[in-house]
Amino acid sequence: RDTDRSRGLGDVYKRQGLYWKYESWLKKMDYQLYSAIGAAGELFAIRTPLYEEMPEDTLLDDFMLSLRIAMKQYTIAYCDTAYALESGSADMKEEEKRKVRIAAGGLQSVYRLKELLNPLRYGILSFQYVSHRVLRWSVTPVALFLLFPLNILLVVCSESLPVYFLFLLLQSAFYLGGVYGSLLSAKSVKNKFLYIPYYFLFMNINVIKGFFYLKRHAGGTWEKSRRA
């Protein structure tokens, strides 16, 4: 999968490109262990008999369908030579819409695929699903923002343990880097070192927004993000 460079996507393209490389690496590792977890709709092929209709309000039908097939003891293969071309989001506001919708669909999938949370039944597939997807969409965003006040409490209550203070400094620097990266991005200023904390926080904030999006939108339709 690639995005169309010819339309001047700039920072948005780079963010999506780096994130996609990371996701592709995870999918490759998942496949080498047992099975890829989920599939991108534009790069997804299955045997016709394995296809099944998803509920009309499903937000991530490609993800849901691929995992339902994997739950039948089929393998989702990862092919690193498959190639698709699409334009990236026009700007970070449009990318935010996309991330919120994906997060909402992910949370919806966690509820609808709750039987996959049983490792006694699904073994390695269950472990991969929880570690790669469920934690990302449910636990990580909440834990991320609880860590800061909890770290402050540890510093206050454990004066004799400077390691907690060091962790607090590192965490503060990471968050401040994300905020500064956001300000630079708004001014179209590039800084690859601040990209990581900025995009990491950007994604996790949008997971929380995705939760409220899911509560407000009962249907499976959404406002499509503008492409560059």
What is each residue range found by the language model?
Residues 125-184, 195-206:
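Alpha-helical bilayer-embedded segments of polytopic membrane proteins, i.e.
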